[in-house]
Amino acid sequence: MVKIRLTRGGAKKRPFYHIIVTDVRSARDGRNIERVGFYNPVAQGGEKRIELDLARVDHWVKNGAQPTDKVRNLIKEATKSQAAAA
C-alpha cells in the first residue's frame, strides 16, 4: 500500500517535515517514491509554512495512495491558501 506521509528533518527543537509518497512498509525516514512538498510548523518571518505540489498529490491519490490524517489536513490548508492567493 502506498501512503502520503511526513518525514522529519531539521534540527533539534526546530522540526521540518518533507511530505513524501512512500510504501507503508518503509521506515519513517527511509526510502520514498516521490517528494511532493514540505511543511515547516515553526516558520518565522518570510518563511513558507507549507509548499505542496497539489497536481502530484492528486495524481497519487487517484492512483490509490492514502494520505495520513495530518497530511490530509495540510492538503486542505494548502488548497485554501492557493485559492486565496489566486
UniProtKB/Swiss-Prot annotation:
Q: Which domain of life is it from?
A: Bacteria
Q: Listed GO molecular functions?
A: structural constituent of ribosome
Gene3D superfamilies the record matches: 3.30.1320.10
- Does the keyword Ribonucleoprotein belong to this entry? yes
Gene Ontology cellular component terms for the protein in this record: cytoplasm; small ribosomal subunit
Q: What Pfam families does UniProt report for this protein, alphabetically?
A: Ribosomal_S16
User: What are the GO BP annotations of this UniProt entry?
Assistant: translation
Does the keyword Ribonucleoprotein belong to this entry? yes
> PROSITE patterns per the record?
RIBOSOMAL_S16 (PS00732)
Keywords in UniProt for this one?
Ribonucleoprotein, Ribosomal protein
Q: Which family does it belong to?
A: Belongs to the bacterial ribosomal protein bS16 family.
- Matches recorded under NCBIfam families: S16
| Name by which UniProt lists this protein | Small ribosomal subunit protein bS16
